[in-house]
Curated annotation (Swiss-Prot):
<dbReference type="InterPro" id="IPR050990">
    <property type="entry name" value="UPF0237/GcvR_regulator"/>
</dbReference>
<dbReference type="InterPro" id="IPR002912">
    <property type="entry name" value="ACT_dom"/>
</dbReference>
<dbReference type="InterPro" id="IPR022986">
    <property type="entry name" value="UPF0237_ACT"/>
</dbReference>
<dbReference type="Pfam" id="PF13740">
    <property type="entry name" value="ACT_6"/>
</dbReference>
<dbReference type="InterPro" id="IPR045865">
    <property type="entry name" value="ACT-like_dom_sf"/>
</dbReference>
<protein>
    <recommendedName>
        <fullName>UPF0237 protein Cgl1544/cg1742</fullName>
    </recommendedName>
</protein>
<feature type="domain" description="ACT">
    <location>
        <begin position="4"/>
        <end position="82"/>
    </location>
</feature>
<comment type="similarity">
    <text>Belongs to the UPF0237 family.</text>
</comment>
Amino acid sequence: MFAIMTVTGQDHTGIIAAVSTALAELDVNIHNVSQTIMDQWFTMILHVGFDESVLDIATVQERMKPVEKEQGLVIRIQSEALFNAVNEI
């Protein structure tokens, strides 16, 4: 399954490391990533892939909650199909 993950919050050291480590522990592969900082506000969008017979989106979201709390972030994930449908012009 492919999904889109968004990460936002106050910029500080270690955000990318914390998010990528948590995803690696879940065996979630990062296919593409775009990251920027706007006025001390960190934003990152990741295109990720994982085996949906082993893991589902709800589990990924739940397992990212400790990273959200520890890093002071908002992390959201949705299926690539849903993301594309919502953002289609």
